[in-house]
A protein has these predicted regions:
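Proline-aspartate-enriched helix->loop->beta-strand connector
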Residues: 1-6, 14
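Secondary-structure boundary/capping motif
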Residues: 19, 51-54, 158
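Glycine-rich phosphate/pyrophosphate-binding loops
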Residues: 35-55
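Electrostatically charged, flexible surface regions
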Residues: 56-176
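Alpha-helix C-terminal capping segments
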Residues: 1-3, 29-40
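A short, flexible beta-alpha/helix-coil linker loop
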Residues: 14-17, 48
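Glycine/threonine-rich flexible loop motifs
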Residues: 16-25
């Protein structure tokens, strides 16, 4: 495999980087750091239960595809490999958007103690697959697909031609 351009690969993270979880992902954050430095980037994540067969099969073809695919200024690729057996993987879904949800719904159970104090215990429940919006990254991985999508930087200018006020005030910060 030969690469025609320099790129940053971040990951492979254990656990999905989908939906709202992208916001605090170190894997996606590292890819964004590369982007800030003008380097195209791909963030990879995988949810597996002891087997990396799906990742092993799809990783190189996905890398080859994405390195030859155009991506907008201010965007990175985000790839998530499903947590299923290879025989249950249904292929690749492209152009997945981040779901407006988290894979795990986090709660705290509050228990009052006899002395009047409280104990808070964290509790996480996995999102029901039927709640994942169709076309989203979570829907793809929950249904046994490799999910490929773009994540846009909220700080860097996008590839569209619009000029935001902050770009006019701080133009030197946005040169790639």
């Amino acid at each position: 495999m030969s690469f025609s351009r320099r790129a940053d690969f971040s990951g492979i993270n254990f656990g999905y980087n989908t939906g709202f979880d992208i916001a605090y992902s170190g894997t996606v954050g590292a890819a964004m750091e590369a982007l800030i430095n003008g380097i195209p980037a791909i963030a990879f994540s995988s949810q597996h239960d002891g087997s990396s067969d799906v990742t092993d099969k799809y990783l190189v073809p996905v890398i080859e595809e994405l390195l030859s695919s155009p991506i907008g200024r201010g965007e990175i690729w985000n790839v998530n490999f499903p947590g299923c057996a290879l025989e249950d993987c249904r292929g690749i879904l492209r152009e997945r958007i981040p779901a407006p949800l988290c894979v795990f719904d986090n709660h705290y159970d509050k228990t009052e103690q006899p002395d009047g104090s409280f104990i808070l215990r964290p509790y996480a429940e996995q999102l029901s697959p039927d709640r994942a919006p169709e076309g989203s990254d979570i829907h793809a991985v929950f249904n046994g697909y490799v999910s490929i999508g773009k994540v846009k930087s909220m700080v860097l200018p996008s590839s569209d031609k619009s000029t935001h006020a902050w770009q006019r005030v701080f133009p030197v910060l946005f040169v790639l």
